[in-house]
Amino acid sequence: MIACLSLNPCWDKTMTVPQFFLDAPNRVQTLRADVGGKGVNVARAAAALGAECCLVGQDYQGAPVAAAMAREGVACYLRPAPGEMRVNLKIQDQAAGRTLEINESGPLADGELLPAMKALLLAHCPAGGWAALSGSLPQGLPPESYALLTAALKAAGVHVAVDCDGAALERAVEAGPDVIKPNAQEFQRLTGVNPLDRAAALAACRALHGRGVGLICLSLGAAGALLSLPEAAYSCQAPRVPVRGLQGAGDSMLAGLLTALARGLEPAQALAFASAAAGASVQREGTLLCRRADVEKLLPGLRVEKIRL
């Protein structure tokens, strides 16, 4: 079982315009709206890859989170929340080949949110299962929120993966999560190290292992990915695919990694599966995520190399 936490779900709205102009009307060419947020995306991608998973989180008034997830075979355990679900807007400028992102913060969390999420996670993620704690924290929650949940879950025998940024990630590291999955920018903010400097990045990973982090999956976009364990490290090139949408690639990578680990795959195999999932995601437009058939097509073309430490 992979239980995916979604503290701050959203509407993911993606618009395309022929050319984006400031101080002038912009006519929308296409519009797509999906229920999203990192936790939702990880659950959707994991389900698409065949994993047994569920979504734990908040359900805002008028937000069809449960209905959307049910269509994809994901069980939901949601706590009713006041307010409206936030909107993440992406405007794709076709002429420039660039995307403008505008993300709302979302409603203020109440004091009962964290205890409620802890209880739901412990109730629906058995010992030996995985919990994925990902995404931004709602306003009102302290930065140590993921650290507190990590400690409680690990004490119950649950494996924990954390995918977040900034102070929340810094605090979570202190609780010794089994997996973290930073991208290049998040890794640099966490460690102060350029992730493209492999020797320095691996040294920073070893320091994180020394603080209790089990496995580090460092996603580097077109430069591929690194997987670091206390005793070994691996690299994998990025799949060669047409890039149609970057949104959700990291969530697909985490879903692929956890699906592989839950199936008992070795680390090198898990990295290949995660990289294929990310590649399968970027070749789809907007907020569409990976598909199992695409992952299986990409896997044979990926080569994982063990890095000499």
Predicted regions and their residues:
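Gly/Ala-rich phosphate-binding loop of Rossmann-like dinucleotide-binding domains
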Residues: 47, 154, 262
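Short beta-strand scaffold segments in enzyme catalytic cores
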Residues: 44, 89-91, 224-228
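Conserved phosphate/ATP/ADP-binding segment of small-molecule kinases
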Residues: 143-231
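Conserved phosphate-binding/catalytic region of the ribokinase-like
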Residues: 170, 198-309
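Conserved phosphate-binding/catalytic loop of the ribokinase/pfkB sugar-kinase fold
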Residues: 80, 91-127
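General beta-strand structural signal in soluble alpha/beta enzymes
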Residues: 5-7, 57, 77-78, 132-133, ...
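Positively charged, low-complexity intrinsically disordered leader regions
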Residues: 1-23
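Substrate-binding N-lobe of the ribokinase-like
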Residues: 27-85, 298-301
